[in-house]
Amino acid sequence: MSSYIERIEAHNFKSFRRKKVINFTKGLNVISGPNGSGKSNIGDMLLFVLGTKSIHAVRADRLSDLVSKGSGNECSVSVTFRSDDGRSLVIERRLVIEDEPKSYYYVNGVRSRLSEIDETLASMGINFGTYSFVLQGDINDFISYSGQERRKLIERISGVDQFDSEIERVKADIEAVSRNMEINQTIIDEKRQNLERLRTEKEKKERYDALLKRKRDVEYTEILNRKNAMERQKRTIEGQISDLTKEIAQLEERRSDLEKRSEAIRIRREDVAKRIDDLTSGEMNRVKTDLHSVEVDIAKIRGIIDEKNRNMEKLEETIAKYESERDSTDREIEDLDRQIEEKAKRKRALEDRYADLKKRYDDLFSRAQAEAVDAAETRRKSKEYQEKIDGLGREIEELKAAGSQMNADLAVLLQKKAALEERKEDLDLKIRTSEWKAKETSEDMGKYSRKYYDLKAKYDQINDRISDLKSEISEKEASAKIASSRVPEYVRNVKMLEESVEGVIGLVRDLISYGEKYVKAVESAGGGRLNAVVVKDDAVAKECIQILKDRKISPMTFLPLNKMRDPPAQRDVGKISKDPGYLGILMDFVDFEDQYRSAVYYAIRDTILVQDIDAGRRLMGIFRLVTLDGDIFDPGGSITGGYRNYASDYASALRMQHDLEGMKIQLSSLMDDRSRIKREMDQAFSEMSEASRRTGEIMKEQEMLKKEAERSREELKQVMDDISSTDRAIADKKRMIDENEKVIEQKTLDLHKYQEALNDLYDRIDPEFFKNIGDLSNEINEVRSEIDAVASELNQITSRRDILSSERKHLEDQMIDTKLQENSIAAEIDDLNGKKRELEEKAKKYQYALNDLEGRYGNLSAQVREADKQIREMENGINDAKASIDLKNDLMNDLKVKAGILEGNLSSIERELSSYSGCEAVIGDLQAMRQEIERAIMDLGEINNAAPQQYEDALKDLDDYEKKHEKLMEEKKALEETTAMLNEKKREVFVKTFTDISEKMNYVYGIINGGTAKLIMIGSDPLTSSVEVSVTPKDKATVKIQALSGGEKSVAALSFITAVQILMPSSIYFLDEVDMYLDAYNAENMIKMISQNAGEAQTIVISLKSLVFSYASNAIGVTSVNGESFVFNGHFDGSPEAAP
């Protein structure tokens, strides 16, 4: 779809004072006029409306210069665009000069922002490319450009300047990274010096610790020798007790597992049963109710459509009746036309016969005069008598004919009066109907306008949210990138296994999700077990372990799902659930797929989540506990806690990635909402525009009807005046006829006298001759009477035809009104059919939903039956395990009694050995060893006990800085590669644009001049090269553009500009005196090419050359009177001087 400028309306803009309207057409529009008349101000109008950023673009020093002098403090310009499908778009800019100049933009009369203008133009298929406006001076600028300036021009055209800001940003990043590298290197040097000092102190402390340990080992060996004998006696009994304990624990675990599984199945069964109740009592009933409601609405709409169709049939019958009456009237008019033609033909034949008879009579009478005896006197008197007779006869006939014509005119006027009165009543009815339609349409437009701006407010709100979310995503992606760089080695190894072996599912931590509130609790409770790898089966685990061995990768823990035991039934937490600090079983706060339950249980076990460390202290001793802050309470009594940097580990990276995915889903949803609202906005805008268009059409129709009614009233008044005038004229004619009849009576007496005198004369002439004259006279009178009769009949038939034509016009108007009603009802039927289709589609969706719910009901019922079967099997296994446990406990009690006796003997030795934890037994002379160790300790002198930890901390710190240095080097390298890539991309885009323009320029120059022209790049690097223009005019040598004549330079520059226009086409072009320096040959070739292009894009050309107008589809003249510009549309006679 393409659009064009239909008209420009300016008020007090520059030299166009008051209101000026300029009309344009598609194709080539030529503007001409004397220099200084204001032609170029038309281009300034377009730039002003389109919101040019520079005041100098519209050839003004300040905004107040745009207002016509002496015209107040305000000016405005509106441009009407028309699309191929008939839509119109009016963009207006008003400038008010107050304390500060203010501009207001309007789209179709609605206040808008400048930023919305481009979107609105794009919706009409209107775009402006490079060189859409070629103003005075653009050609000379190109000719005078240096090679560097031409290159920069091509850079702007190609758009490569967009790369410059990115390249500068990357360079700034490189400088910042380099500065950070220098600072980091200085710190590394200082830390290396400190590390060497700590290394010496650490080695000294290690020697001291080794001596102390050896001394304690000697003491420990002396005690241990006393203990060994007693322990050998005890081991046998403990082994037996241990075996029994393991067997009992296994049986207890099996029983507990069966109880938990049984309870879990029972809970799942209750949940499924509840879901069945919810499904049957809630959602299915709602869907059935909604389906019934939609079916009722469909039936209602069908009834309305049937009623509308019956109305359509009635209207069609009315139209058929009007068409029949119109056809009958047309046949009668055709018959009258044939009668008029026959009567006119008969009248012309009679007039011809009358002329022939009159000529014969005159000939005979002349002979009679010639043959008279008293030639001189008799001829004179007979001629005088005859002229008087003829004159009286004609006068009488003319008076009678005038009277008859006036009576016929009066009849026509009376018929016309009746038709006008009927037409006036019809127009009054149409005006009232149109006013009602205008009110209804205006209300619709208000409704659509409110809807549009409500949607627009939502659209702006969502757009702002999208912008904010995109910023948040960018920040989150940057953080995620940093976090991803800290992914541990084992994670990358798991990724490698996933790619190498089918059946590797992933880390346990990757298969679970939980809220931010529970991060510390889950990470502490799971610990390293969260890094276990879940695989499909033990065969996959075997294959993975072999790969790790082959590649010398550290061991990993694998969890084959086919070998993992189901988690035991949940233990009864008892009274601790009533404690205010108790939160629940930790696994209940973690989300995962049920197939991975055994793997998740391996990591988290049956750990209980509590509020804080105080709650843990109250509840510790029976269950494993974890606080929200990550502190662990072991059933054996140990407490593990302290600071953890959870945010920096792999879990944090996963959560960040998860949050990022959620934000992207939210962004996608928002963008879908924005697209939907945009479609609704477009629909509302279309409805608003349609209502506005209908209102405009109705207002135009109202105006037209009012004007037509006014014309009818004036015409009726004129007819009444004509009737009165005709009545008076008829009365005057009657009076004149009466007077003439008296004169005729007198003239008849005179005629008898003349006749007697003639008879005396004729007695002396041949009687037969005068008989012929008398016969001719009688025949002439008869023909004259017949002519008058035919003329009277012709007038009557013509009057009847005029009356029938007026009746036919009235029938046509009634038919048009009826068809408009028919079209309105048809549109309503289309809308109702659309609503019916929407409801039918909605009913289908409800039916599909109902079918899906019934399927879900069947599946849930099957799950309940299966759960009942599993529960029975679990109860049987629990009873068997209890019996075995009782038997094992009896055996173990007997062994414990024996072990108690030995434990008492060893207790004193154990208390003594407890102070030597970590010591090892030695072999040799223990006394000599002790003396040697004590001397060595004295020789070491002062010891820094914190040296080992300080050394490790310093070593880790140095390693962190060295890794940071490596990352900075990698970052710098990546940034340098990015800079090179951007420069290469910029170079590619520039070279392609340069080549395309050069080829098109040569093509255009060949059409205009017949020669060749191209661009030449001077320099090895396109981005720093100089661009020259090489031209070979037809039949001339090749030279640079600077060496050409003025006209030849213009041809070359125009070729370049036209080449850019071809590559980056626009809907509309404005060319201001681009042919100024061209000779006739080149100017004509140029205008031919422009006129051909005008078939695809509207072109507005300002020119003073006469040959341009022979190619124009529209000519516009501009003249100036006392500094005020006037515009005239039309066709010129071929020269600009002819412009008004």
UniProtKB/Swiss-Prot annotation:
Q: What is its main location?
A: cytoplasm
- Domain (SMC hinge) spans 502-619
Write out the coiled-coil annotation as residue ranges: 160-484, 660-990
The alphabetized list of GO BP terms reads: chromosome condensation; chromosome segregation; DNA replication; sister chromatid cohesion
Localization = Cytoplasm
Q: Which InterPro entries match?
A: P-loop_NTPase, RecF/RecN/SMC_N, SMC, SMC_hinge, SMC_hinge_sf, SMC_prok
Listed under GO cellular component are: chromosome; cytoplasm
**Which of UniProt's keywords are assigned here?**
ATP-binding, Coiled coil, Cytoplasm, DNA-binding, Nucleotide-binding
Q: Which domain of life is it from?
A: Archaea
Specify which residues bind ATP according to the UniProt entry for this protein: 34-41
Task: Report a single Gene Ontology molecular function.
Answer: DNA binding
Which family does this protein fall into?
Belongs to the SMC family.
- Any domain commentary? Contains large globular domains required for ATP hydrolysis at each terminus and a third globular domain forming a flexible SMC hinge near the middle of the molecule. These domains are separated by coiled-coil structures.
HAMAP family per UniProt:
Smc_prok (MF_01894)
User: Which proteins does it associate with, and in what oligomeric form?
Assistant: Homodimer.
This molecule's function is given as: Required for chromosome condensation and partitioning.
Q: What is the name of this protein?
A: Chromosome partition protein Smc
